[in-house]
Amino acid sequence: MLKRNKVVLVGAGGVGSSFAYALTIDNSLVHELVIIDVAQDKAKGEVMDLNHGQMFLEKNIKIAFGNYDDCSDADIVVITAGLNQKPGETRLDLVGKNTKIFKEIVTGVVSSGFNGIFVIASNPVDIMTYVTMKYSNFPTHKVIGTGTTLDTSRLRYFLAERFNVNTQNIHSYIMGEHGDSSFATWDETKIAMKSLSEYIAEGTIREVELDEIHKKVVNAAYEVIKLKGATYYAIGLGIKKIVNAIISDQNLILPISSYINGQYGNFIKDIYIGAPAVVCKEGVKEVLDFKISDRELEKFKISANQLKSYIDKIEF
């Protein structure tokens, strides 16, 4: 008998419902989705709305409203719950509020007997991923945050627009905090087989333009929040990408919130931060210790130290 894959979503807000919709319309891998939210009517409404579209799907998926007991046999628990970033707020402003929320959620999930993989998308995601690891006492490879996957997607979109190529031909990452202290790996970036440094040498693009592109990446969330109140479609797709990579054992390299403990020159320890890692059915197979330039390593340390300064204030 084929194994039936089950995902539980905690959080039926904009991000959670966008992920649920993305998972539903591309549901070849997941057989059951349970949605949990403290706002029970909202979660029930999302379940009803999704179920009413079953006739239009290639394959039906069982979608239900539930509670933490439903996590006991889940393969993956996705957490998108928590307070959202408001106009003028940084993601780090949410640390204290969302840590309290996460303690209750993670305790509830683990008490069910859940032994699968956590995927965290709530902000500040790097810190909330660390918080989940601490409160769950799970091994680090079974706790994953969305990290800089969305930032990287934004970067590749902007570069693809600039060079008039498909995003699949852009090989570049945003690393560090999912937030203002992130950095682009310009020194390692390639457009197809050609390095970005070659394009700069040819005069095709200038470094000042690259600075502007990175600023667009960093400010993208603020722009979307200003225009429509919140970001959720793109990150919903990003969560689905991570979930699919786990369910189908893809060994896919993604810049998730990875647990760093001595990689990248042994300067960064005991922290979750955006860095490329291999995602598989066990969660994280390996955090890739890429050789990055000295100037990028310095940015990585600055970003890590900023996150660490917030983590050190949390009492576990």
UniProtKB/Swiss-Prot annotation:
InterPro entries reported for this sequence: L-lactate/malate_DH (IPR001557), L-lactate_DH (IPR011304), L-lactate_DH_AS (IPR018177), Lactate/malate_DH_C (IPR022383), Lactate/malate_DH_N (IPR001236), Lactate_DH/Glyco_Ohase_4_C (IPR015955), NAD(P)-bd_dom_sf (IPR036291)
Principal location: cytoplasm
Pathway(s) served: Fermentation; pyruvate fermentation to lactate; (S)-lactate from pyruvate: step 1/1
Modified residues (Phosphotyrosine): Y222
Record: residues binding substrate: Q85, R91, N123, P124, V125, D126, D151, T152, S153, R154, T231
Example GO biological process: lactate metabolic process
Residues the entry annotates as binding beta-D-fructose 1,6-bisphosphate: R156, H171
Regulation: Allosterically activated by fructose 1,6-bisphosphate (FBP).
GO CC entries: cytoplasm
Localization per record: Cytoplasm
Keywords tagged on the record: Allosteric enzyme, Cytoplasm, NAD, Oxidoreductase, Phosphoprotein
Binding residue positions for NAD(+): V15, D37, K42, Y68, G82, L83, A121, S122, N123, T146
Enzymatic reactions: (S)-lactate + NAD(+) = pyruvate + NADH + H(+)
Keyword match Iron: no
Alphabetical list of PROSITE patterns matching this protein: L_LDH
Role played: Catalyzes the conversion of lactate to pyruvate.
Family statement: Belongs to the LDH/MDH superfamily. LDH family.
Subunit structure: Homotetramer.
Name this polypeptide is given: L-lactate dehydrogenase
Gene name of this polypeptide: ldh
